[in-house]
Amino acid sequence: DLSGKIICPGFIDGHIHLESSMVRPAEFERAVLPHGTTAVITDPHEIANVAGTEGIDYMLYETENLMLDVFFMLPSCVPAADLEESGAVLRAEDLRAYYENPRVLGLAEMMNAPGTVKAEEGVLAKLKDCSDRGKRIDGHAPGLSGYQLNAYCAAGVASDHECSEVEEALEKLRRGQW
C-alpha cells in the first residue's frame, strides 16, 4: 500500500566508466545518489587495462553493498589496441566466470570492429561466450557502415554509442542496433 507516499523514478546512467571519476565507488555514490541517479551500468575498462581481473574484482567488491545499483558490462578489449602494453591482457577465458554474476549484464564496447568483421578467433570467442549466456553485447564502432556493419551486427553487437552523424545513426538503427 503506497497511500500517502510519493514514487519518484531514478535516473539510470546507461554507460559510464566509474573508475574515471577518480574516486572510490562509495564516494561516487555520495555524489550522484542525492541528485537522482539510482543505478549505473559501468564498463571497468580503464582499471582492467592496468590491473586485469584484479581490477574487475575490486570494482565488483567495492560496489556490492552500495545503495546505488551498480551493474557491469565486461571490458571487451584489454588492451584497447594490439599496439598497447598497459599492464593486462584479458582473453575470453578470463571473462567467463564473471557472466555468472547477476550484476554482469554483458560485454562492453566491442572496439575491435576489424577483428569482429574479420572473424578473429579471440574476438569471436568473447562474443560467443557472452551471447551463449543470453547477455548483451555493446558496440563501439564509429564510422562503420555497409558490409562491415552487416558483419558487425551479425556477430551479435546490439548497440553503438559512437555515432556522430545522423546518417550513420540511421544506418545502424536500420540494421537493428540502438
What residues fall within each predicted segment?
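Active-site core of metal-dependent hydrolases
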Residues: 109-178
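Helix N-terminus capping/helix-initiation residues
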Residues: 23-24, 91, 139, 145
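Catalytic metal-binding/acid-base residues of hydrolase active sites
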Residues: 17, 45-46, 142-143
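Divalent-metal coordination cores built from histidine and acidic residues
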Residues: 26-134
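Short, structured secondary-structure boundary patches
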Residues: 3, 58-66, 157-163
